[in-house]
């Protein structure tokens, strides 16, 4: 089922593989802007297909770097509506 959540945004940790990648895909398909945080890039093919996904390479144990990326995303989208933590899952 495809819904329209245009204007909503999500931050996903561990977003480049397994469950995180699938969640990123589903949220993107429902018009949610997604900040994908991971050490591994999901690849240009994925990012070109899911245009409202934005990838940032970050180690989630580095709080300063994590905060920097999340604050920039929040400023751009005015809010963060969803947080999905899949790092290490």
Regions found by a protein language model. Name each.
Residues 72-85:
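A glycine-rich helix->loop->beta "capping" turn
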Residues 20-21:
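N-terminal Rossmann-fold NAD(P) dinucleotide-binding loop
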Residues 1-8:
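Flexible N-terminal pre-Rossmann segment of NAD(P)-dependent oxidoreductases
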Residues 9, 16-17:
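Conserved glycine-rich cofactor-binding loop
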Residues 87-89:
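Conserved NAD(P)H cofactor-binding loop of Rossmann-fold oxidoreductase domains
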Residues 57-69:
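The beta1-alpha1 cofactor-binding region of Rossmann-like NAD(H)/NADP(H)-dependent oxidoreductases
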Residues 27:
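Aromatic pocket-lining residues of Rossmann-like dinucleotide-binding sites
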Residues 30-46:
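Conserved glycine-rich Rossmann-like NAD(P)H-binding loop of the short-chain dehydrogenase/reductase
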